Regions:
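Q-loop/switch helix immediately C-terminal to the Walker
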Residues: 65, 69, 74-90
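Helix-to-loop junction immediately C-terminal to a conserved catalytic motif
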Residues: 36
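Walker B catalytic motif
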Residues: 135-136
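The feature captures the beta-strand-to-loop junction immediately N-terminal to the Walker
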Residues: 21-23
Length: 207
C-alpha cells in the first residue's frame, strides 16, 4: 500500500492555467481523478463557486476531464466527436488546417498524435467552467504542441484549466500558477529556480 495523496489542496479560477508537476507515479493523475469524481477518498472536498460536489457525478457544463489515455471510440468520425462535445468542426480546422476534409474520417484511421489533438481540442473548446488536462501534449509534434498552447491561452479567458504533463517546460510556459506534487503534498513553486532547489529539474549549469 502506497499513499500518494494525503495533504493536497488546489485552487483554480476562471482565467487561470494551473500547472501541476511531479515525478512519475507521484499522484498527479490520482489528484485529477479525485477532482473529477472518478476516485473517492476518505477525506476530500471538491467545490465549484463554493458549492460542494458531494457525488461522483460531474456535469459537462461544470467540468471536462481529458484522460491520460485515449478515450474516444475508434469507430466515431471526427465530426461525431466534436458534436458530442458541442464544438464546431469548422473552428477546429481554423486552428489545425491540416485536418481539413477529415470530418467523416474515423478516429481509428488517425495516428496516436492526431487522435490526441482531436481529443484535447474537443475537451478544451467545449462549454465548461473548468478543464482538467492529463498529459495533453503526449505524442504531439512540437508544432502542434505550440498551437495547442495557444488554444489553451485563448480558452482560459472563459474557464479555469488544470494541466499536468511530463513536458514540464511547456507546462511552465503556459501556467499562471505552478505547483509540484511531492510526497503526497502540493507545493507552490515560482518557476525553474524553485524546481531546481526541489531537485525536480537540473539547474542551467547541469548540476
Amino acid at each position: 500500500f502506497n499513499r500518494v495523496l494525503w495533504d493536497a489542496c488546489l485552487h483554480c479560477e476562471t482565467g487561470e492555467v494551473v500547472g501541476i508537476l511531479g515525478r512519475y507515479g507521484g499522484g498527479k493523475s490520482c489528484l485529477m481523478k479525485v477532482i473529477y469524481g472518478e476516485l473517492r477518498l476518505k477525506d476530500q472536498y471538491v467545490a465549484i463557486d463554493g458549492k460542494a460536489l458531494l457525488t461522483r457525478e460531474r456535469r459537462p457544463e461544470d467540468m471536462r476531464y481529458l484522460l491520460q489515455q485515449s478515450f474516444v471510440l475508434p469507430g466515431l468520425s471526427v465530426k461525431q466527436v466534436f458534436d458530442d462535445f458541442g464544438v464546431a468542426f469548422e473552428s477546429f480546422v481554423k486552428d489545425f488546417p491540416d485536418f481539413a476534409g477529415t470530418a467523416r474520417k474515423r478516429m481509428k484511421a488517425f495516428s496516436t498524435g492526431e487522435r490526441r489533438i482531436i481529443e484535447v481540442y474537443a475537451v478544451l473548446a467545449s462549454d465548461s467552467k473548468f478543464c482538467l488536462l492529463d498529459e495533453p501534449f503526449s505524442f504531439m509534434m512540437p508544432l502542434h504542441v505550440q498551437k495547442m498552447k495557444e488554444v489553451i491561452q485563448r480558452e482560459k479567458k472563459r474557464k479555469g484549466i488544470v494541466i499536468t504533463d511530463h513536458y514540464f517546460e511547456d507546462v511552465i510556459d503556459i501556467s499562471d500558477e505552478l505547483f509540484i506534487l511531492r510526497s503526497g503534498k502540493i507545493w507552490r513553486v515560482n518557476g525553474r529556480e524553485d524546481l531546481e532547489l526541489l531537485g525536480y529539474i537540473r539547474n542551467t549549469n547541469g548540476v
